[in-house]
């Protein structure tokens, strides 16, 4: 299906992802459920305004961690609050989708390896994160990685309005220009450590304003030029 996507008078190119050939077709809609990343790399404390909110020093290098691919859900799916957690938070983030295998590349080359950009909600069991002192358990539950609604290529990733709303109320609001490490620096840094494969995701960190999700909530993550990622929240049965 061919679609036309236009917002605020600017036209954007939508990427059609074919995992066999990793083709980029201008104007085709994306079935984001076809993305099969081998890994999801997330970045912590990557917004200047978020660091100020937490009264923390600016990191010298990106702080990275992994989320499992089993946590992925999509637009309009349910986020399930696990029974063992009493506090589950939202975190809206711009996510990079890798288009070509890469290792040890420079930031000036990074754009050649990027398929496009999407939205990721880095859902976190905050109470477990605080108990553990590390992040794996808190960020790895099933349904804790909503992504979507599409992948977009031709936008300026470093000047996008980013926002999270819960039940229509704005909770997070910033711009990607407030990132400490830009998307190209992040690709360079991660690729210096591990090989990146087509479909792999690098999520670029969240702005200030993170907070709790409760059963019955509707959480909407919106990034300029990409769209709205909407999910519903319920408790584990």
UniProtKB/Swiss-Prot annotation:
Which keywords has UniProt assigned to this entry?
Answer: Metal-binding
Give the Gene3D superfamilies listed for this entry: Fumarylacetoacetase-like, C-terminal domain (3.90.850.10)
Q: Which GO terms describe its biological process?
A: small molecule metabolic process
User: Domain of life, per the record?
Assistant: Archaea
Biological source species: Methanocaldococcus jannaschii (strain ATCC 43067 / DSM 2661 / JAL-1 / JCM 10045 / NBRC 100440) (Methanococcus jannaschii)
Q: What is this protein called?
A: Uncharacterized protein MJ1656
MF annotations from Gene Ontology: catalytic activity; metal ion binding
A Pfam family name for this chain?
FAA_hydrolase
The record's annotation in InterPro entries points to: FAH (IPR051121), Fumarylacetoacetase-like_C (IPR011234), Fumarylacetoacetase_C_sf (IPR036663)
* Record-listed a divalent metal cation binding positions: 91, 93, 122
The family assignment reads: Belongs to the FAH family.
